From Swiss-Prot:
The lineage of its organism: Eukaryota, Viridiplantae, Streptophyta, Embryophyta, Tracheophyta. Occurs in almost all aerobically respiring organisms and serves to protect cells from the toxic effects of hydrogen peroxide. This is Catalase isozyme B. Its EC number is 1.11.1.6. It is found in: Peroxisome; Glyoxysome. InterPro entries: Catalase, Catalase_AS, Catalase_clade1/3, Catalase_core, Catalase_haem_BS, Catalase_immune_responsive, Catalase_sf.
């Protein structure tokens, strides 16, 4: 074996203790001192190495989605959609692709309870024959904002106050009072689904609009949906308090224990598609991430199933170092002009480079399983063995060539450079429809959560009035009930 091409792993552990460089360690219990009670000597390299390594064990926490759990498995195509996409891993029923999935909470820190009211991340990395595909979504089909320009401000509002280091309702209510497009997302977050029972019993959504392209270059806008075969289950507020007080890692434990017991979680993948030529036929913009596509007019189409049948081997290597980015796509799947997706394309890779370093895609959990070739050389923590003489392109001494051209959306865009909001905002209709779909008891729980949120003493009379106005525009009875419980008059 060529030692220069050997990747270190626990599989090559020696039977005795060593330093990182392989030197034998005959005493891992005591520091080197002058005599039995004398001072420690600086020449105790093993002690210095051990402490220095310990001091650097932690890496920067994810700015969002810090708390998470991962598992591995496979995705299998069950229905032919080759007329919609030329993606190789979707080429025919029966095709299987290895995957790794990370579930997470969003706002709270790495050690926070998994029972807090918060969206849940649902990110899937497909290791395909044409490179990796990252489908990075949530357990709710919409989002709070439609323009990524507001993403840092939104996260700041949700995160703890810079003064008190506590999450405070008045900051959230204040920020989103300027963003009525958030009402639809809040109709999910303040609903029962705001606290999933665990990761196995929650849905997943790609959230953003993507584009499928077939072999003829025909594009279709697409939304991705994951449906758990064991059904959707949630925790009510009092149940969440009990569960969280018993085990703050209950969802991680449930996922790990279920897989270990052979009770493998499974999700069915569905898509919705819209012909770009028909995108103006709706009362919403299909690129607006705050909207769902009504399933009665844009039905779900089955694609495949995902089974998680293996727990990760190491939390740090396969969860903390696991990195997703919506920019990582494969031929046959492309981006759309969704404003939030466009900003995520940059931001996700940028934060991974900050967290893990410029060569984070070389880490085993992030590297593609297919062959790959480029001149992205060197940089911090580059551990790939390379012996090429040519590190430029093109060259007559290197046979590497361009890949075959793949179809991309043929759309021609024209327009003025401008910063503006979309024409079809329609901020209240879908939120109202969702509220009216609840049974009376569920409506009352939703209402009470908003009463509690707006009862924060820092929230002004003006802010309460704005939110009552917003919810009144979603549903008049909801606004009236909210005003009544807050002892205010609804002001449309």
């Amino acid at each position: 074996m060529d030692p220069y091409k050997h990747r270190p792993s626990s599989g090559s552990n020696s039977t005795f203790w060593t330093t990182n460089s392989g030197a034998p360690v005959w005493n891992n219990n005591s520091a080197l001192t002058v005599g039995e009670r004398g001072p420690i000597l600086l020449e105790d390299y093993h002690l210095i190495e051990k402490l220095a390594q310990f001091d650097r064990e932690r890496i920067p926490e994810r700015v969002v989605h810090a708390r998470g759990a991962s598992a591995k498995g496979f995705f299998e195509v069950t229905h032919d959609i080759s007329h919609l996409t030329c993606a190789d891993f979707l080429r025919a029923p029966g095709v299987q692709t290895p995957v790794i999935v990370r579930f997470s909470t969003v706002v709270h820190e790495r050690g926070s309870p998994e029972t807090l009211r918060d969206p849940r991340g649902f990110a899937v990395k497909f290791y395909t024959r044409e490179g990796n595909f990252d489908l990075v979504g949530n357990n709710m089909p919409v989002f709070f904002i439609r323009d990524g320009m507001k993403f840092p401000d939104m996260v700041h509002a949700f995160k703890p106050s810079p003064k008190t280091n506590m999450q405070e309702n008045w900051r959230i209510v204040d920020f989103f009072s300027h963003h009525p497009e958030s009402l639809h997302m809040f109709s999910f977050l303040f609903d029962d689904v705001g606290i999933p029972l665990n990761y196995r019993h929650m849905e997943g959504f790609g959230v953003n609009t993507y584009t499928l392209i077939n072999k003829d270059g025909k594009p279709h806008l697409v939304k991705f949906h994951w449906k758990p075969t064991c059904g959707v289950k949630c925790l009510l507020d009092d149940e969440a308090v009990t569960v969280g007080g018993t085990c703050h890692s209950h969802a991680t434990k449930d996922l790990t224990d279920s897989i270990a017991a052979g009770n493998y979680p499974e999700w069915k993948l569905y898509i919705q598609t819209i012909d770009p030529d028909h995108e103006d036929r709706f009362d919403f913009d299909p690129l607006d991430v705050t909207k769902t596509w009504p399933e009665d007019i844009i039905p779900l189409q089955p694609v495949g199933r995902m089974v998680l049948n293996k727990n990760i081997d190491n939390f740090f290597a396969e969860n903390e170092q696991l990195a997703f980015c919506p920019a990582i796509i494969v031929p046959g799947i492309h981006y759309s002009d969704d404003k939030l997706l466009q900003t995520r394309i940059f931001s996700y890779a940028d934060t991974q480079r900050h967290r893990l370093g410029p060569n984070y895609l070389m880490l085993p959990v992030n590297a593609p399983k297919c062959a790959y070739h480029n001149n992205h050389h060197d940089g911090s923590m580059n551990f790939m063995h390379r012996d090429e003489e040519v590190n430029y392109f093109p060259s007559r001494f290197d046979a590497a060539r361009h890949a075959e051209k793949v179809p991309i959306p043929p759309r021609v865009l024209t327009g003025c450079r401008e910063k503006c909001v979309i024409d079809k905002e329609n901020n209240f209709k879908q939120a109202g429809e969702r509220y009216r779909s609840f049974d009376p008891a569920r409506q009352d729980r939703f209402l009470q959560r908003w009463v509690d949120a707006l009862s924060d003493p820092r929230i002004t009379h003006e802010l309460r009035g704005i939110w009552i106005s917003y919810w009144s525009q979603c549903d008049a009875s909801l606004g009236q009930k909210l005003a009544s419980r807050l002892n205010l008059k609804p002001n449309m």
